[in-house]
Structure formats: structure tokens, C-alpha cells
Amino acid sequence: EVLKMKKVSIIYWSNGGNVEIIANAICEGASIGDVEVETKHVADASIEDVLEADAVAFGSPAMINDDIEEIDMKPFINNLRELDIKNKPLVLFGSCGWRDTKFIDKWEKKMEDYGFNILGKLTVRDSVEKENIIEAKELGRLLTQA
């Protein structure tokens, strides 16, 4: 029997800032052993990237009204509502600058409602600290074990 490689999809919106740094750190943490990791900006991602993955991570900065980025990320996420998610393991990450971290809690609740199994979440403020990177790598590892 051929063991299928585990697949992890990391999908995020970032304008080259903190969210991208965290996405890359999660990717690094997940890139161990026989794991195929794909990191994509949401503009290049498809629903298949979520469906075909064994575990996923989504990232977005906090925008107005404690919401995720609404031109690309929000419609992408909303499209997942109709899918049979079957408790797929998920990590959420984002940056909130001066805003509070309510947006990620709100997002987590929505993803639970969609059927995801939330393994963890990570928010960074103005700049990415060393401990954020360590935590992000750890979340990446978690995704491979789920």
C-alpha cells in the first residue's frame, strides 16, 4: 500500500506584511517528513486547495468592523460554507495592528460553524516578534500531526 503524502494548504491575504511572514513560518514548521505544503495568496487559491488538503491554515489582517480582508479573503471563506468540511483541522492567523484581537475570535466561531476543527490561532500586533515565529512554526507542526 502506498502511503499518501499528507497535504497542508496555507492560504492567506497579505500586502507583503506580517501575515505573509507568519504564513511562511507556518509553512516552515509544517515542512517536515513526508508532508507536501502549499502556501498561496488567496487570489491564487481555489476551493480545491482546501478540499484536497488534510489540514489548512488561513491568514488575514484585521480590517474594519473586526472583520477579515473583504475583497478577496472574505468571499473565499464564505464559499466554504456549502462544503462538506468533515472536521478538517484548521489554524487561523492574522495581524491586527492597533485593533483588538476580536476579529480572530469572530473568525474562529464562523469556521467552527462551517465544520472545521480549530487547532490553534495566532495574532500578531505591529511587528512580528521572535516568539510569534516560534509559535507559528509550532502551529505548522500541529497541522502535520492532525
Residue positions per predicted region:
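Short, Lys/Arg-enriched N-terminal segments with co-localized hydrophobic residues
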Residues: 1-4
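FMN-binding flavodoxin-like domain, especially the glycine-rich phosphate-binding loop
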Residues: 6-8, 18-21, 25-45, 49-146
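Aromatic-flanked redox-active Cys/Sec active sites in thiol-based oxidoreductases
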Residues: 12-16
